[in-house]
Swiss-Prot record:
Gene designation per UniProt: vps51
Renumbered residue ranges of the record's region Disordered: 94-151, 760-805
SUPFAM superfamilies referenced in this protein's UniProt entry, alphabetically: Cullin repeat-like (SSF74788)
Summary of the function given for this chain in its UniProt record: May act as component of the GARP complex that is involved in retrograde transport from early and late endosomes to the trans-Golgi network (TGN).
Organism: Dictyostelium discoideum
Organism lineage string: Eukaryota, Amoebozoa, Evosea, Eumycetozoa, Dictyostelia
InterPro entries, sorted: Cullin_repeat-like_dom_sf (IPR016159), Vps51 (IPR014812)
Family assignment from sequence similarity: Belongs to the VPS51 family.
Composition bias, Low complexity: 101-113, 128-142, 775-785
Full protein name: Vacuolar protein sorting-associated protein 51 homolog
Length: 917
């Protein structure tokens, strides 16, 4: 029997009936795992694998036969227990017993066959039915049990008590459980009357009557069917008895005829034995020569298949004969055939790999190539990688061609993109699973399957990310948020149809979330980019129109235009964000609105942090640390500080109003409560003001450096830079006029952007600040009198301190400025005078030089008093005069009357010139 089954049937029988892997099979039935795997893939050379499969086949059939015989014996016992006994039992299928015997019989049946009680034969059901019927009839005549009790006893007699899903102890002992053994009619009746209305009671009555009638009909039908089968069984038994009577004579006749046939067969065999052996020999030779003929023609057949691209047929030819060729490879002719076939198959493999990698190969041809290579037992890793590489390259080329197309309407483009990519993507996933995952059902390589799944996941993610990047890049080129939402909805609906293919690596939720979040990031990134462009455009305008912007209100208009442009960009941002929460247009986003809203709030906070603490202040870092500081003038910083002042007074209020409107729209469109972050407008105004003041401080420091350069240049402008041999002074040096003119320019510039405070209303607070500043300078002055290092090496001291003088003085000695013209100008002048004082410490003066500086300082004192109407700078000017006196080799102060006369003459001359002009 085992010799009659073919190898192909053995393989099919293995896959159909064996549920474990080849390793478990070899441990149970013997053989080698590699040999078994090759045998299962079509290489039938392994005798051990064939013997193991036949052993499995024989054992399986033997078990089935034993189970069948055991079932026949059980049926016979059941038949005897049901219909056996005396002759009286042959007349009727109804077994009349007493109630006690019926109950006992039912219990015994349940105990002995409890494990198969749900699969009883109809004969046992007939017995149970007859027992229950007789019991019910007897009880009804004596005690008058209701019909429902009779039906319940009938079913319980057949199935046995306590069998079923709902047979737990609590429900079985419930007196209100109509199917339980503890059922109490009176309690059930009282309970249902109390808990039900009249209509419900009538409905319950009709239901129970219908169930009773149905069960009665089923029981009668069951009894009739079993009675019919019983009659048929008795007829069969009678026929069997009749036929058995003549069986002995028939067997004797059959034995006689068999002996005659045996004698004739022996005579024929003895007569034809010689010829039969010859015929068998010739028949075997014919079959052998036919095989040899096919083997000799195998190379030409393979070449023909290769030319016709019938690769599957070539693989079948090769695999079916490779075993014979290997078996007789020691014979030269067979060795030549095998070498030629191997060469042809190698050529075919190369062509298959080439076709697999070609972009022009169709989807079906690509799958066929991979399948044929797998049938040729090529390494799975190599075929898998080549297949994925080919399909990935083909799909990416498709996406790149779509990416290059111009887009007029984003919705139409997304539809075309989905139609091309998603169909290709779905086919790739399905074909890959059929080739490398589902194909591995018969192998024991769980690691191989896992590796295939991981590579499929990477393949899918790469392609899907490329697809999403193209969609996002195209979406970013459109400004209409409504059209973007429609495009996202198309992506959502189309990708949702591929849920099964995406389940292993990408969820539709992640796709929508990432797309929407990226779109939100784009809005905010674009806002930051636009603000940077506004600021750079502002700086370019200031550099190109240096003089024009100072005419009229051009500077203020430029500042206001930049501020309003930034606010308009913020307004546009909220307009772009609102469609995400409009329920009539974004139904598919309803489940994502809470995360979208949280994302927007976080991005808003990051934006204000960027605007206040990062973007505006980064220009200060550029000016302080990079070589590009020259492209940002002090005027640019002044305008930037005025923009901060605008945001503090108006911009923040408008932004808060826009945010409140946006939150209202979001709450109306959301299906559940949104978590709204607290927005501290006063704190934001404070931060904006602090940023503006920092910028204004840097502007003040840069402006003071210009004044400081003028004063330092005046110190270096004397002949030979020698203050010891200077001629007797007779006038104020011209550098002081240049210094005052530069101050007037700063005043004109700052007054166009910052509020102007009346000089006469300048509070005493400025004088107190000046006094404190004077004290600090005096302390520094006294400390400079200690080791006289400046006197010994003034040039070295100058080179080491000139770069950081203004910064150090500004940080330690000058109060922070405020948003008004007077505060800024006072800070600029004070810082320049402090720096000038430090420069005086590095010089050595003669008597005339000391007198010249004394005259210059007195002239500045008078001029600054005329400008500001206060004595804010007297202490600083006095400190400068004290420094010159200390640095003079022969300090003889010039008479105050002479100083006053020279300065008054200069002042009058200056006023006359101004009046004439």
């Amino acid at each position: 029997m085992s010799q009659s089954i073919s190898d192909i049937k053995l393989v099919k029988f293995y896959y159909r009936h064996y549920k474990l892997g080849p390793q478990d099979f070899c441990r149970e039935y013997g053989g080698n795992v590699d040999g078994l795997n090759k045998f299962l893939t079509g290489n039938y050379d392994s005798l051990a694998a064939r013997d193991a499969l036949r052993s499995f086949w024989e054992r399986f059939n033997t078990n089935q036969l034993m189970k069948s015989q055991a079932g026949d014996e059980d049926d016979g016992d059941e038949f005897n227990s049901t219909f056996g006994g005396g002759d009286s039992m042959l007349l009727s299928p109804i077994k009349v017993t007493s109630p006690m015997s019926s109950s006992s019989s039912s219990t015994n049946t349940t105990n002995s066959n409890g494990q198969i009680i749900g699969n009883r034969s109809f004969s046992s059901l007939a017995e149970a039915t007859s027992n229950a019927t007789t019991t019910t009839t007897s009880t009804t005549t004596t005690g008058g049990k209701p019909e429902s009790k009779r039906v319940r006893n009938l079913l319980k007699t057949y199935y046995g008590p306590g069998i079923g899903e709902g047979s737990d102890s609590s429900s079985m002992n419930d007196p209100l459980n109509i199917d339980g053994p503890s059922f109490n009619l009176n309690s059930y009746f009282d309970s249902i009357v109390k808990s039900s209305t009249l209509n419900q009671l009538i409905q319950k009555d009709n239901q129970m009557v219908s169930e009773i009638r149905t069960l009665d009909g089923d029981m009668k039908t069951l009894v009739y069917d079993n009675y019919t089968k019983f009659i048929n069984a008795t007829d069969i038994i009678k026929k069997m008895k009749t036929n058995v009577e003549n069986m002995e004579e028939g067997m004797a006749l059959l034995s006689k005829n068999m002996d005659l046939i045996t004698n004739c067969s022996e005579k024929i065999n003895s007569t034809l034995s010689v010829r039969r052996d010859r015929i068998d020999q010739l028949s075997g030779l014919q079959k052998f020569f036919q095989k040899l003929q096919f083997l000799t023609a195998l190379p030409s057949s393979l070449n023909h298949c290769l030319a016709m691209q019938a690769y599957n047929q070539a693989v079948r030819y090769y695999n079916s004969n490779s075993g014979i060729l290997k078996q007789y490879s020691h014979i030269p002719s067979f060795q030549n055939i095998q070498n030629e076939c191997d060469s042809i198959m190698k050529t075919m493999k190369d062509k298959l790999y080439e076709r697999l990698s070609s972009l022009s190969t169709s989807q079906t041809d690509c799958v066929e190539s991979a399948e044929v290579l797998m049938d040729l037992l090529e390494p799975v890793e190599l075929v898998r990688s080549k297949y994925l590489e080919s399909r990935k390259h083909h799909t990416i080329t498709l996406l790149e061609n779509l990416e290059k197309k111009s887009v007029e309407h984003i919705t139409d483009y997304i539809k075309e993109l989905n139609a091309n990519f998603l169909s290709e993507y779905s086919y790739n996933i399905t074909s890959y699973k059929s080739l490398f995952i589902n194909r591995l059902d018969g192998s024991d390589s769980k690691k191989e399957r896992q590796q295939s799944l991981l590579q499929l996941e990477d393949f899918s993610k790469d392609l899907f990310n490329k697809y999403l990047n193209i969609a996002k890049s195209k979406l970013s080129s459109f400004k209409d948020p409504i059209e973007k939402i429609m495009a996202l909805e198309i992506i959502n609906s189309d990708v949702s149809r591929l849920g099964s293919e995406l389940s292993s690596h990408e969820k539709i939720t992640n796709i929508i979330n990432s797309t929407v979040h990226d779109q939100i990031d784009f809005y905010f990134d674009n806002l930051q980019k636009t603000i940077k462009e506004h600021i750079h455009q502002l700086n370019s305008t200031l550099n190109e129109r240096r003089d024009e912007v100072l005419e009229g209100h051009n500077l203020q208009e430029l500042s206001d235009a930049t501020s309003k442009a930034i606010v308009n960009d913020i307004i546009l941002l909220f307009a772009n964000l609102k469609p995400f929460f409009l329920p009539t247009e974004t139904q598919f986003l309803s489940s994502y609105q809470d995360t979208i809203f949280t994302k927007i709030q976080v991005k808003l906070q990051q934006f204000f942090l960027f605007l206040v603490n990062i973007h505006f202040l980064e220009y200060l870092d550029i000016i302080a640390t990079t070589s590009n500081r020259e492209q940002f003038s002090g005027r640019f910083l002044l305008v930037l500080s005025s923009i901060c002042l605008y945001f503090e007074n108006k911009g923040i209020t408008l932004v808060v109003q826009l945010m409140s409107e946006f939150i209202t729209v979001a709450k109306q469109g959301a299906k559940k409560e949104l978590n709204v972050f607290s927005f501290n407008a006063p704190d934001l105004c404070k931060r904006v003001r602090e940023t503006g003041l920092q910028i204004l401080n840097v502007f003040t420091r840069l402006s003071s450096q210009k004044l400081d350069k003028i004063l330092k240049k005046g110190l270096e402008s004397i002949p030979n830079n020698n203050w010891l041999v200077l001629k007797e002074p007779r006038d104020v040096r011209s550098v002081n006029d240049i210094y005052l003119e530069e101050i007037l320019k700063f005043q004109n510039e700052t007054s166009k952007l910052l509020p102007v405070i009346n000089h006469h209303h300048h509070s005493l607070k400025s004088h107190s600040r000046t006094g404190s500043g004077g004290n600090s300078v005096s302390s520094n002055n006294s400390s400079s009198n200690t080791p006289d290092g400046h006197r010994r090496n003034p040039s070295a001291s100058s080179s080491s301190s000139s770069n950081n003088t203004n910064t150090t003085l500004f940080e330690k000695k000058v109060d922070h400025v405020d948003f008004n013209t007077l505060s800024v100008l006072i800070a600029i002048i004070k810082l320049s005078l402090k720096s000038f004082n430090e420069s005086l410490r590095l010089k050595t003066f003669g008597t005339n030089g000391c007198h010249q500086i004394q005259i210059d300082l007195h002239y500045l004192k008078l001029s600054l008093y005329d400008l500001f109407g206060s004595n804010s700078f007297d202490n600083l000017l006095q400190e400068c005069e004290n420094t010159v006196t200390e640095r003079c080799v022969d300090p003889l102060p010039l008479a105050k009357s002479i100083v006053s006369k020279i300065c008054e003459t200069k002042m009058n001359k200056k006023k006359n010139n101004e009046a004439e002009s």
